[in-house]
């Protein structure tokens, strides 16, 4: 049943709803973690339609809880007056041990928690892949792009030759 519902998301079968492609360029991701999200019913239905944007969002630890801030899940058309607020703070569900590890990384090492992917797992539950990352400087971004381009050219040459 879950795979049938996942096929409704923009014709995708992997359950992916939204991806933060800019985060791989802007940040150097060291560690990833899967977190659950507390959603209301209209948000889940909107996600099943693929109407979400996590490009400008981030996660932060506040008062011993992990929150997703500035993520946009558009309103669901069939929910009329019982709809949700599109850019509200959403609580992320992680274990106590994972939360303490994340908060230590942010406080001590000055890292950032960035959302990478929003998707439905095999059981049909909405999950968010978050990464612990450090910001890249402009020269790091150029160097990363140059390495990627060289790898692409090298693969093209090896394939042709």
Swiss-Prot record:
It is found in: Cytoplasm. Keywords: Cytoplasm, RNA-binding. Required for rescue of stalled ribosomes mediated by trans-translation. Binds to transfer-messenger RNA (tmRNA), required for stable association of tmRNA with ribosomes. tmRNA and SmpB together mimic tRNA shape, replacing the anticodon stem-loop with SmpB. tmRNA is encoded by the ssrA gene; the 2 termini fold to resemble tRNA(Ala) and it encodes a 'tag peptide', a short internal open reading frame. During trans-translation Ala-aminoacylated tmRNA acts like a tRNA, entering the A-site of stalled ribosomes, displacing the stalled mRNA. PANTHER family: SSRA-BINDING PROTEIN, TMRNA-BINDING COMPONENT OF TRANS-TRANSLATION TAGGING COMPLEX. It comes from the Bacteria. One of its GO terms (cellular component) is cytosol. SUPFAM superfamilies: Small protein B (SmpB) (SSF74982). It holds the Pfam family SmpB. HAMAP family: SmpB. Gene3D superfamilies: 2.40.280.10. It comes from Hyphomonas neptunium (strain ATCC 15444). Its main location: cytoplasm. The keyword RNA-binding applies. This is SsrA-binding protein. One of its GO terms (molecular function) is RNA binding. GO terms for biological process: trans-translation. Residues 1-23 are annotated as: Disordered. The gene is smpB. Belongs to the SmpB family.
